[in-house]
Amino acid sequence: DYPGFASKGAYPIFDNVAAIFSATPGITRTATYLFACTEWVEDAFRGRELLHDIYSRLMNPTSVSLANHIVDLECGAEANQYMAWNFNSGMAAIDGILSHLVGRDDIILSSRNIYGGSFQLLHDWYAKSAKLGVALYWFDGYDQKAFSIALEEVKKNEDERLKMGRKILVYLESPCNPHGYVLDVAGISRVAHQ
């Protein structure tokens, strides 16, 4: 039981105005919003007024409520220090994270057993020289030993990039799609952070 945790049993207290006194949040089923004046439009698009929604694919009361509730569940008393983002698909989430972290000429070391869409994104976008020119490596195996061997090989092969300040990013999916293999994420993470 966390102080300040906005929940009563299985029913959270929603920050969604339409859900006041409701057991579940209201679902916003619109793509566009009306504004009373042009000043409100400008405030919304410049981020000065967070209660003015612009377009449902950007943000809407339903997705904001979901994100805030996830933060409450995950962070408890420290929820006010965190935020969450919702994505409409797993691929959107993967690309959102990668496009934020990966820079031109960086290095990605990925487990070989990943979803086909993830493979295409890494191979056909990030690794293309006309795009980001990322050096893409794959490792077989499921534990920290297999990963450690692959990481040392990548460091040896990409010595020049590393000297230029490029970073190695590790991409894992576990359980792996489509076979369901489970990786030793904790062990691989320990090696990656050494």
What are the functions of these language-model segments?
Residues Y181:
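Basic, Gly/Ser/Thr-rich N-terminal segments that form RNA-phosphate-binding interfaces in CRISPR RAMP
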